[in-house]
């Protein structure tokens, strides 16, 4: 009768092991999918940051070219003013004022170019920073939502606990007793006296 009680215990242990194996595979698949998603988010963020860096570089080159052009115009204008003043033989505060006004105009234009570049760069930098922080928080959430695998010891002890519990309940019900409390019916056997 011992084997009749041991079979369900063994089956429950096998089911527990099978369930743990299926759960471990599911957790591993979810973890792998989460990590692939995190890598894709990081790749997209890197591409976006590279694109924004190229935009910032382009804005810098545009501003540099515009400043170079303005400096050339300034040199020509100041040279023309000096030549005109020299040819007219005029001197004094009025002539100095004409030079200062012309220089001030070029300085204001150069400052506008510089300010426009700074504004564009700040917008690009804010986009890079926002994209990077958003990606970091998404990746952090992916890693926080990962389920943890059971330890190897836990994977061994859980089925043993289930089997031990089944064995204890079977023992308590008397399934392992060598003397059975129920008698087998021999009524159906031919030629056997039943004592009636």
UniProtKB/Swiss-Prot annotation:
Domain of life of the source: Viruses
Compartments, as annotated in UniProt: Virion; Host cell outer membrane
Keyword Membrane on entry: yes
GO CC term (a single one): host cell plasma membrane
Keyword vocabulary terms for this entry: Host cell outer membrane, Host membrane, Membrane, Viral genome ejection through host cell envelope, Viral penetration into host cytoplasm, Viral short tail ejection system, Virion, Virus entry into host cell
Gene Ontology terms describing biological process: symbiont genome ejection through host cell envelope, short tail mechanism
HAMAP family (UniProt xref): GP14_T7
Subunit note: Interacts with the portal protein. Interacts with gp15.
Similarity remark: Belongs to the T7virus internal virion protein gp14 family.
Function comment: Component of the cylindrical core that assembles on the inner surface of the capsid during capsid formation and plays a role in viral DNA ejection into the host cell. The inner core is composed of stacked rings of gp14, gp15 and gp16 proteins. Following binding to the host cell surface, the internal core is disassembled and gp14 is ejected along with gp15 and gp16 into the infected cell. May form a simple channel spanning the outer membrane.
Protein name: Internal virion protein gp14
């Amino acid at each position: 009768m011992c084997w009749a009680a041991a079979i369900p215990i063994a089956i429950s242990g096998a089911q527990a092991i099978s369930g743990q194996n299926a759960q471990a595979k599911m957790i591993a698949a979810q973890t792998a999918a989460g990590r692939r998603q995190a890598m894709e988010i990081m790749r997209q963020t890197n591409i976006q940051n590279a694109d924004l860096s190229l935009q910032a570089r382009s804005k810098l080159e545009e501003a540099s070219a515009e400043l170079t052009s303005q400096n050339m115009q300034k040199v020509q204008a100041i040279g023309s003013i000096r030549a005109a003043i020299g040819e007219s033989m005029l001197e004094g505060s009025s002539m100095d004022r004409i030079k200062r006004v012309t220089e001030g105009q070029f300085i204001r234009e150069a400052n506008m170019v510089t300010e426009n570049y700074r504004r564009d760069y700040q917008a690009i930098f804010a986009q890079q920073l926002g994209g990077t922080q958003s990606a970091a928080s998404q990746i952090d959430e992916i890693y926080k939502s990962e389920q943890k695998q059971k330890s190897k010891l836990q994977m061994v002890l859980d089925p043993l606990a289930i089997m031990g519990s089944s064995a204890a309940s079977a023992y308590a019900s008397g399934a392992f007793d060598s003397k059975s409390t129920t008698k087998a019916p021999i009524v159906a056997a031919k030629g056997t006296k039943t004592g009636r």
